[in-house]
């Protein structure tokens, strides 16, 4: 896999022509859109055709399927190849680019170049990055600040691919999974939480926490850290920042929070009273869950720091309709609602299921969960089991291995066996289509069906809806 190169480029003018490997992914396609919007000649390749590639072509971006050195065209010295950590060092286009003297940048370094010269905001944390980044983009827009943003997910109802280039602050979702979030030098850091993950990369929880300290140390002079007072890891990071003389603003239900949440109602449309500087303000959302109230408070703090009017920010947050694959309603058939969510860490799964309960009302919460990564499944099988026990019925698929190699001893059965529910309420069904058939035959009117995970479990919901519509 290809990690950050350590290269630094001040702005996009020096990038030359840019070719992106894996351009169909949401992060890479967003960078392609932003670069094209700034007049850069952009091309890219991906492993398979997709609607994303079609949309990029409509913007004048040359895209091709498959990885072949010929797809580089006459790219040479002075031009740039952008890669992600998912790109293997043996990729033929990468090898050819290096031979030609093409500059190679990691995705995060390209994003840092786009952020250069703007009031940058980097949103990081083990959970909630995409939703918080999306909320912040919506809030800044509502306040008239015309933000740029690059988010690891699309806003519900939007068609911008999670990326937009405005004239105001630049909001970037900062991915900690490979350590590349240390490439940014923003004026505001938002850290929603710090809970060990990606130990395949970091090795230890201590190394994971240290990476967040390095991330905060990259803040520009006079910059601000927005941190969650309710999360121990984030609170510890706030202490580190204060020790380095960094300004800190905390949020949460904790009595120590600078922006405090009271009377929190985590129902289908969550709400709270947000107290800022002794002034109580009503925070109302159209999305469920305590975790989303916290995400909204983080977005509020960052937006106000950037000069947004607090009232306009809260009005924008009230209109936030969610991000794709974040409690996204996929449809309803035979009285069964299907919601899709990207949750892939035990804490995320627990927060999701707690948020789902009031939405389900008197109906059952049925979840089909796909573990993501062999390393994460091995490390957190027991924790996943405890979180999934909050559902009424559980189906576990096999592991989506993604960038890792399969391990016959690490399957979805590890998670299914760890769910402390009666055997009849937990099933291990490795195949997605078989799981969809079983679910369509067993769900009933009033149920809320959740498809959960960071892999291709998202295809199960539409398949179940089609089967329900036929019966």
UniProtKB/Swiss-Prot annotation:
Q: Which residues form a coiled coil?
A: none
Which pathway is recorded for this entry? Cell wall biogenesis; peptidoglycan biosynthesis
Q: Where in the cell is it found?
A: Cytoplasm
Q: Name one Pfam family in it.
A: Mur_ligase_C
Instruction: Respond yes or no to whether keyword Cell wall biogenesis/degradation is given for this record.
Output: yes
Matching SUPFAM superfamilies: MurCD N-terminal domain, MurD-like peptide ligases, catalytic domain, MurD-like peptide ligases, peptide-binding domain
Q: What GO MF terms are annotated? A: ATP binding; UDP-N-acetylmuramate-L-alanine ligase activity
* Location (main, coarse): cytoplasm
- Catalytic activity, as annotated: UDP-N-acetyl-alpha-D-muramate + L-alanine + ATP = UDP-N-acetyl-alpha-D-muramoyl-L-alanine + ADP + phosphate + H(+)
Which keywords has UniProt assigned to this entry? ATP-binding, Cell cycle, Cell division, Cell shape, Cell wall biogenesis/degradation, Cytoplasm, Ligase, Nucleotide-binding, Peptidoglycan synthesis
Q: Give, as one word, the top-level EC class.
A: ligase
- GO cellular component annotations, sorted alphabetically? cytoplasm
Q: What is its EC number?
A: 6.3.2.8
Q: Tell me which residues bind ATP.
A: 125-131
Q: Name one GO biological process term.
A: cell wall organization
Q: What does this protein do?
A: Cell wall formation.
Q: Which family does it belong to?
A: Belongs to the MurCDEF family.
Q: What is this protein called?
A: UDP-N-acetylmuramate--L-alanine ligase
Species for this entry: Kineococcus radiotolerans (strain ATCC BAA-149 / DSM 14245 / SRS30216)
